[in-house]
Regions:
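Hydrophobic membrane-insertion alpha-helices, especially the h-region
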Residues: 29-45
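Hydrophobic single-pass membrane-insertion segments
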Residues: 43-56
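Catalytic glycan-binding domains that act on GlcNAc-containing polysaccharides
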Residues: 106-291
Length: 291
């Protein structure tokens, strides 16, 4: 398991104590991303970008060792820490008033109803399906579609980076591949591990698909999210479920601030990455309440 840095844990504890002294407000368990994370990451005021980067943040980094020196100064409680980030409103993915409709129809209707949040219905169906799947196999994780959407936005703008779009089958019309992980441009050097099977590169690995899995990570976490018998890192249904399993690993409960932070930080070891995912997940939660 990737080790959550002691500095972050200390900051979360400081914020929790501060909240206890600030009028006794209680944070609801139902919050997807609770106010402690906002405070720890300085998200009281945050400019939210509306488009994904040209490429993913890049690659997995080495796990942080327990012995790593912690020289971070104590964190002052930032303004706005009492604000609770918005959580999804309305019916859960797949819910319906028509008991005779199949799950695909339910997910489509649910996604169509949330088109105003700024995510294509096809991507929303994948995120909603992943929430349903993980709720069934790892109910203690409390994974929400908004966390997956936050990651999908940062990684590839929901499978549309570079001007492509998602097809009806959930695959980008043009494949999405990150730069070669050859040790240049601050990327980790990862020689080819898949013979080019997933990323088309027989010299170095590349991040692949809507959620930018690198081949060796995909081999461990691959999933068949749409039941077509194929686990495809280019299929948003498959990668959304795989990402859900990755985030929920090691018994994490994403309704807890520290676990949510650890999960997203494990996906990419950058504080700026966690801030971006948080901001976009929070934005989608707020927009889901706007109608």
């Amino acid at each position: 398991m990737l080790v959550l840095r002691r500095a972050v844990i200390r900051r979360l504890r400081l914020l929790w104590k501060a909240l206890g002294r600030s009028g006794g407000r209680l944070l609801t368990q139902g919050a997807l991303t609770v106010a402690l994370i906002a405070g720890a990451l300085g998200l009281a005021v945050y400019a939210v970008p509306h488009a994904g980067p040209d490429w993913a943040y890049g690659e997995e980094t080495e796990p942080v060792a327990d012995s790593e020196q912690d020289d971070d100064p104590p964190l002052a409680v930032p303004p706005g820490v009492d604000a609770i980030p918005c959580v999804p409103a309305g019916p859960a993915p797949g819910s319906t008033t028509d008991p005779n409709s199949d799950m695909d129809s339910r997910l489509k209707a649910w996604a169509d109803n949330l088109a105003h949040v700024g995510i294509s219905p096809r991507a929303l169906q994948a995120y909603g399906n992943a929430e349903i799947v993980l709720a069934g196999v790892k109910p203690q994780c409390h994974l929400s579609w908004t966390t997956l959407a936050g990651i999908g936005s940062v990684e590839t703008n929901h499978g549309t980076t570079g001007g492509t779009s998602l097809g009806a089958d959930g695959r980008p019309v043009e494949q999405i591949r990150g730069p070669a992980l050859d040790g240049t441009n601050n990327n980790k050097r990862i020689p080819d591990t898949d013979g080019g099977e997933y990323d088309g590169d027989t010299k170095f690995d590349r991040a692949v698909g809507p959620m930018q899995f690198i081949p060796q990570t995909w081999e461990r976490w691959k999933a068949d999210g749409d039941g077509d018998g194929v686990s495809d890192p280019n299929d948003i249904d498959d990668v959304a479920v795989a990402a859900g399993h990755y985030l929920c690993a090691d018994g994490r409960d994403l309704s807890r601030a520290a676990d949510w932070y650890a999960a997203v930080f494990a996906y990419n070891h950058l504080d700026s990455y966690v801030r971006d995912v948080y901001a976009r997940a929070d934005e989608y939660g707020k927009k889901s309440r706007s109608r």
